[in-house]
Protein backbone atom coordinates (compact mmCIF):
# COMPACT_ATOMS: atom_id res chain seq x y z
CA UNK A 1 0.00 0.00 0.00
CA UNK A 2 1.41 3.39 -1.01
CA UNK A 3 0.26 6.70 0.47
CA UNK A 4 1.61 9.77 -1.30
CA UNK A 5 1.63 12.44 1.41
CA UNK A 6 3.84 15.14 -0.12
CA UNK A 7 2.68 17.79 -2.63
CA UNK A 8 3.50 17.61 -6.33
CA UNK A 9 5.37 14.30 -6.16
CA UNK A 10 4.81 13.76 -9.88
CA UNK A 11 6.76 16.97 -10.64
CA UNK A 12 9.93 15.86 -8.90
CA UNK A 13 11.06 12.45 -10.21
CA UNK A 14 14.69 13.15 -9.34
CA UNK A 15 13.75 13.22 -5.67
CA UNK A 16 11.12 10.47 -5.55
CA UNK A 17 12.49 8.10 -8.22
CA UNK A 18 10.28 4.99 -8.51
CA UNK A 19 7.82 6.45 -6.01
CA UNK A 20 6.94 9.32 -8.35
CA UNK A 21 4.28 7.29 -10.13
CA UNK A 22 4.03 3.77 -8.69
CA UNK A 23 2.09 1.26 -10.75
CA UNK A 24 -1.34 0.55 -9.26
CA UNK A 25 -1.08 -3.06 -10.46
CA UNK A 26 1.98 -3.72 -8.30
CA UNK A 27 0.37 -2.74 -5.00
CA UNK A 28 -2.79 -3.42 -3.04
CA UNK A 29 -3.58 0.28 -3.43
CA UNK A 30 -1.77 3.48 -4.43
CA UNK A 31 -3.27 6.65 -2.97
CA UNK A 32 -2.45 9.73 -5.08
CA UNK A 33 -3.86 13.24 -4.72
CA UNK A 34 -4.24 13.59 -8.48
CA UNK A 35 -6.45 10.49 -8.49
CA UNK A 36 -8.76 11.79 -5.77
CA UNK A 37 -7.14 10.31 -2.66
CA UNK A 38 -6.80 12.47 0.45
CA UNK A 39 -3.85 12.55 2.83
CA UNK A 40 -3.98 10.25 5.83
CA UNK A 41 -5.10 12.49 8.67
CA UNK A 42 -2.42 12.96 11.31
CA UNK A 43 -1.81 15.34 14.18
CA UNK A 44 1.08 17.25 15.70
CA UNK A 45 -0.39 17.29 19.19
CA UNK A 46 0.86 15.15 22.06
CA UNK A 47 -2.48 13.56 22.92
CA UNK A 48 -3.27 9.95 22.07
CA UNK A 49 -6.40 8.56 20.48
CA UNK A 50 -7.74 7.61 23.93
CA UNK A 51 -6.98 11.02 25.39
CA UNK A 52 -8.76 12.81 22.56
CA UNK A 53 -11.80 10.59 23.12
CA UNK A 54 -11.91 10.78 26.90
CA UNK A 55 -10.48 14.12 28.05
CA UNK A 56 -12.47 17.35 28.11
CA UNK A 57 -10.95 20.45 26.54
CA UNK A 58 -11.32 23.78 28.33
CA UNK A 59 -10.85 27.00 26.38
CA UNK A 60 -9.20 29.90 28.23
CA UNK A 61 -7.72 31.94 25.35
CA UNK A 62 -8.97 33.44 22.10
CA UNK A 63 -6.85 33.32 18.93
CA UNK A 64 -3.56 31.69 17.94
CA UNK A 65 -1.40 30.48 15.11
CA UNK A 66 1.59 28.13 14.96
CA UNK A 67 4.04 29.07 12.20
CA UNK A 68 7.44 28.19 10.84
CA UNK A 69 9.76 30.89 9.53
CA UNK A 70 9.62 29.55 5.95
CA UNK A 71 8.80 32.09 3.25
CA UNK A 72 9.19 30.11 0.04
CA UNK A 73 6.07 28.22 -1.03
CA UNK A 74 2.80 30.06 -1.82
CA UNK A 75 1.23 29.08 1.49
CA UNK A 76 4.29 30.14 3.48
CA UNK A 77 3.99 33.64 2.05
CA UNK A 78 0.22 33.87 2.48
CA UNK A 79 0.14 32.76 6.11
CA UNK A 80 2.97 35.00 7.29
CA UNK A 81 1.71 38.02 5.34
CA UNK A 82 -1.83 37.49 6.65
CA UNK A 83 -0.70 37.26 10.27
CA UNK A 84 1.27 40.49 9.83
CA UNK A 85 -1.83 42.05 8.26
CA UNK A 86 -3.99 41.00 11.23
CA UNK A 87 -1.43 42.56 13.54
CA UNK A 88 -1.52 45.78 11.51
CA UNK A 89 -5.30 45.88 12.01
CA UNK A 90 -4.92 45.58 15.77
CA UNK A 91 -6.46 42.10 16.01
CA UNK A 92 -4.67 40.22 18.81
CA UNK A 93 -3.22 36.88 17.72
CA UNK A 94 -0.80 34.81 19.76
CA UNK A 95 2.00 33.44 17.57
CA UNK A 96 3.95 30.26 18.34
CA UNK A 97 6.87 28.76 16.46
CA UNK A 98 9.68 30.82 14.99
CA UNK A 99 9.93 34.60 15.53
CA UNK A 100 12.03 35.45 12.49
CA UNK A 101 9.33 37.93 11.42
CA UNK A 102 9.12 39.76 14.77
CA UNK A 103 5.48 39.20 15.72
CA UNK A 104 3.78 41.55 18.18
CA UNK A 105 2.43 38.80 20.44
CA UNK A 106 5.00 36.08 20.02
CA UNK A 107 4.61 33.41 22.71
CA UNK A 108 7.58 31.14 22.07
CA UNK A 109 8.70 28.02 20.26
CA UNK A 110 7.08 24.63 20.75
CA UNK A 111 8.51 21.09 20.96
CA UNK A 112 8.57 19.11 17.72
CA UNK A 113 5.15 17.63 16.90
CA UNK A 114 3.76 19.01 20.16
CA UNK A 115 1.63 22.07 19.39
CA UNK A 116 -0.64 21.63 22.42
CA UNK A 117 0.17 24.97 24.07
CA UNK A 118 -0.47 26.86 20.85
CA UNK A 119 -3.78 25.22 19.98
CA UNK A 120 -5.68 23.44 22.74
CA UNK A 121 -6.36 26.45 25.06
CA UNK A 122 -7.61 28.59 22.14
CA UNK A 123 -11.09 28.99 20.70
CA UNK A 124 -9.74 30.05 17.30
CA UNK A 125 -6.61 29.26 15.33
CA UNK A 126 -5.32 30.14 11.86
CA UNK A 127 -3.17 28.20 9.44
CA UNK A 128 -2.51 27.70 5.75
CA UNK A 129 -1.15 24.78 3.79
CA UNK A 130 2.09 25.23 1.86
CA UNK A 131 0.14 24.66 -1.39
CA UNK A 132 -3.47 24.66 -2.58
CA UNK A 133 -3.80 21.19 -4.08
CA UNK A 134 -7.06 19.21 -4.38
CA UNK A 135 -7.29 16.42 -1.78
CA UNK A 136 -4.10 17.64 -0.07
CA UNK A 137 -4.69 18.75 3.51
CA UNK A 138 -2.58 18.18 6.60
CA UNK A 139 -2.30 18.82 10.32
CA UNK A 140 -2.70 22.51 9.42
CA UNK A 141 -6.43 21.76 9.60
CA UNK A 142 -6.71 18.57 11.64
CA UNK A 143 -4.75 19.89 14.63
CA UNK A 144 -7.29 22.66 15.08
CA UNK A 145 -10.27 20.34 14.80
CA UNK A 146 -8.80 17.78 17.20
CA UNK A 147 -8.04 20.62 19.61
CA UNK A 148 -11.69 21.74 19.25
CA UNK A 149 -10.72 25.11 17.77
CA UNK A 150 -12.60 26.87 15.02
CA UNK A 151 -9.83 26.98 12.43
CA UNK A 152 -9.45 29.77 9.88
CA UNK A 153 -8.01 27.73 7.02
CA UNK A 154 -6.50 28.12 3.56
CA UNK A 155 -5.28 25.30 1.36
CA UNK A 156 -7.08 22.32 -0.11
CA UNK A 157 -9.55 23.90 -2.60
CA UNK A 158 -12.08 21.06 -2.35
CA UNK A 159 -11.85 20.62 1.41
CA UNK A 160 -15.64 21.02 1.65
CA UNK A 161 -15.97 17.61 -0.03
CA UNK A 162 -13.82 16.00 2.66
CA UNK A 163 -14.52 17.80 5.96
CA UNK A 164 -17.84 19.40 7.00
CA UNK A 165 -17.36 23.14 6.28
CA UNK A 166 -19.21 24.02 9.47
CA UNK A 167 -16.18 22.70 11.40
CA UNK A 168 -13.81 25.42 10.11
CA UNK A 169 -13.83 28.72 8.20
CA UNK A 170 -12.26 28.59 4.75
CA UNK A 171 -10.37 31.75 3.81
CA UNK A 172 -9.45 32.89 0.30
CA UNK A 173 -6.33 34.91 1.23
CA UNK A 174 -6.42 36.85 -2.02
CA UNK A 175 -8.12 39.79 -0.31
CA UNK A 176 -6.74 40.20 3.20
CA UNK A 177 -9.20 42.94 4.13
CA UNK A 178 -12.16 40.70 3.33
CA UNK A 179 -10.67 37.76 5.22
CA UNK A 180 -9.88 40.00 8.19
CA UNK A 181 -13.54 41.03 8.35
CA UNK A 182 -14.56 37.35 8.39
CA UNK A 183 -12.15 36.57 11.23
CA UNK A 184 -13.19 39.64 13.20
CA UNK A 185 -16.90 38.85 12.79
CA UNK A 186 -16.42 35.20 13.77
CA UNK A 187 -14.67 36.13 17.01
CA UNK A 188 -17.12 38.93 17.88
CA UNK A 189 -20.15 36.71 17.24
CA UNK A 190 -18.67 33.67 19.03
CA UNK A 191 -18.84 31.31 16.07
CA UNK A 192 -16.78 28.85 18.08
CA UNK A 193 -19.66 28.13 20.43
CA UNK A 194 -22.11 27.97 17.53
CA UNK A 195 -20.00 25.50 15.57
CA UNK A 196 -18.56 23.40 18.39
CA UNK A 197 -21.00 20.49 17.79
CA UNK A 198 -19.81 20.25 14.17
CA UNK A 199 -16.16 20.52 15.19
CA UNK A 200 -16.64 17.63 17.61
CA UNK A 201 -18.39 15.55 14.95
CA UNK A 202 -15.46 15.99 12.57
CA UNK A 203 -13.04 15.28 15.40
CA UNK A 204 -14.68 11.87 15.76
CA UNK A 205 -14.46 11.31 11.99
CA UNK A 206 -10.75 12.08 11.98
CA UNK A 207 -10.09 9.73 14.89
CA UNK A 208 -12.32 6.88 13.78
CA UNK A 209 -12.38 7.09 10.00
CA UNK A 210 -9.87 9.42 8.32
CA UNK A 211 -6.64 8.80 10.20
CA UNK A 212 -4.07 6.16 9.22
CA UNK A 213 -5.21 3.04 11.09
CA UNK A 214 -8.94 3.08 10.28
CA UNK A 215 -8.14 3.88 6.67
CA UNK A 216 -5.57 1.09 6.49
CA UNK A 217 -8.08 -1.36 7.96
CA UNK A 218 -10.67 -0.42 5.33
CA UNK A 219 -8.20 -0.79 2.46
CA UNK A 220 -7.04 -4.21 3.64
CA UNK A 221 -10.57 -5.43 4.37
CA UNK A 222 -11.76 -4.29 0.96
CA UNK A 223 -8.84 -6.02 -0.74
CA UNK A 224 -9.50 -9.29 1.11
CA UNK A 225 -13.20 -9.13 0.34
CA UNK A 226 -12.59 -8.57 -3.37
CA UNK A 227 -9.87 -11.23 -3.67
CA UNK A 228 -11.40 -14.07 -1.67
CA UNK A 229 -11.58 -17.24 -3.76
Describe every region a protein language model picked out.
Residues 1-128, 132-229:
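Pol beta-like nucleotidyltransferase catalytic core
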